[in-house]
From Swiss-Prot:
Mg(2+) binds at residues 7, 9, 164. Pathway: Amino-acid biosynthesis; L-serine biosynthesis; L-serine from 3-phospho-D-glycerate: step 3/3. GO terms for cellular component: cytoplasm. This is Phosphoserine phosphatase.
Length: 211
């Protein structure tokens, strides 16, 4: 079975969930600057995620939920996911972002992934605590890709990875085919192809006999 592993924030969705949550908390500029440094590889993803999560501590959990509910896939992403799955391709999402936002975006598009690996912002007493938990805080996407491939009965060498940021590089390097969607500086060197839209991504996958 062919497997395509997608990053979410900046790839299947154009915006970064945590940046939008930070805007609600009044720390948007500070968090966006840390996000950009992390995506350029200037700061470890785990450190950047913890630092950003700390900045939104105290935000009502309901405000974060409202952000999750408003997350949407970028133009053409839902159609591409549906086409892949209809063709027997296994679609998984490997994200350092947050599973509730991924679920809301897929639900709004009327499509589903075969699997989602992501993180969550911890809340207590109705407020974000500033902590973040999940398999892709310290864990890396190459390991997540290997696990997804093993579950699907395939190998990373036979898989496609699609991402944009520095934290996607491990899975881009592990996959047989690596595709960047408007990749951040330095990430393009790890990509076999780069695209700027879901339509272009679909054409690349078509060329590989996948979509």
């Amino acid at each position: 079975m062919t497997l395509v592993a997608f990053d979410f924030d900046g790839t299947l969705a154009e915006s970064e969930m945590l940046d939008r949550i930070a805007a609600r908390a009044g720390v948007g500029d500070e968090v966006a600057a840390i996000t950009e440094r992390a995506m350029r590889g200037e700061l470890s993803y785990a450190d950047s995620l913890r630092e950003r999560a700390q900045l939104v501590a105290g935000l009502p959990e309901s405000a974060a939920a409202a952000v999750y509910d408003g997350v949407r896939l970028r133009d053409g992403a839902g159609d591409l996911v549906a086409k892949l799955r209809d063709g027997g391709v296994r679609v998984v999402v490997l994200t350092g972002g947050f599973k509730p936002g991924v679920a809301a975006a897929f639900d709004a598009a009327g499509v589903a992934a075969d699997g989602v690996v992501g993180n969550r912002l911890v809340a207590a007493d109705g407020e974000l605590t500033g902590a973040v938990e999940g398999p892709l805080v310290e864990g890396t996407k190459d390991d997540a890709l290997r696990d997804a491939c093993e579950a699907a009965g395939t190998t990373p060498a036979a898989a496609v990875a699609v991402g944009d940021g520095a934290n996607d590089v491990p899975m881009l390097d592990a996959a047989g085919t690596a595709i960047g969607v408007d990749p951040k500086p330095g990430v393009d060197a790890h990509c076999d192809h780069t695209v700027s839209s879901m339509d272009a991504l679909g054409r690349v996958l078509d060329d590989h006999g996948i979509a």
